């Protein structure tokens, strides 16, 4: 908490964290984490710099995607199924700061956003959380926040804007239904159709031989 307070109380580079989400009714650990976050956000010295939004849904997500500068995703690797919210963020020009898990394993490059850690996993989950939390703080302090406030030409963060454009281009080109269907066509449907024609050629002799074996 001390290092987090140092980040959000930095008057030179002000930062605001917005948290939103729901815990499954049986996810006691998740509910306890939300409780701790809410209690921390209620402290007078951080009250206006940490915001927790209740009842997260697609309507709320839409506003977050339109207004955030960076999208922070911290699943406990390797439990992230995909992370589609991060893909939506990238399409909207929001830069990802994420654990290397789910889609970010494929989508990450230093030109498009930031990674938390190096994708390592540990049997001791408490130790893993410690390693990744320190990696997150390092990324925020040394890379993410300075990049946003770097304004060499006028009032525009040049490097940040370059990352935004690269991230949007990557997400729209690669993480889309058009690419998915194209891959299915080239890698599965067309080869399967050609193989079907081969099996049926010459009165299906090859198919009969395969059946015999």
What are the residue ranges of the model-derived segments?
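Catalytic binding pocket for nucleotide-activated donors in carbohydrate/polymer assembly enzymes
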Residues: 13-15, 65-179, 183-191, 199
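Nucleotide-activated donor-binding/catalytic signature segment of Leloir-type glycosyltransferases, i.e.
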Residues: 11, 19-63
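Surface beta-strand/loop "capping" patches
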Residues: 200-213
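Short, flexible/disordered secondary-structure transition segments
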Residues: 48, 195-199
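Conserved alpha-helical elements of sugar-nucleotide-dependent glycosyltransferases
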Residues: 3, 33, 180
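Short hydrophobic signal-anchor/transmembrane segments that target glycosyltransferases
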Residues: 1-12
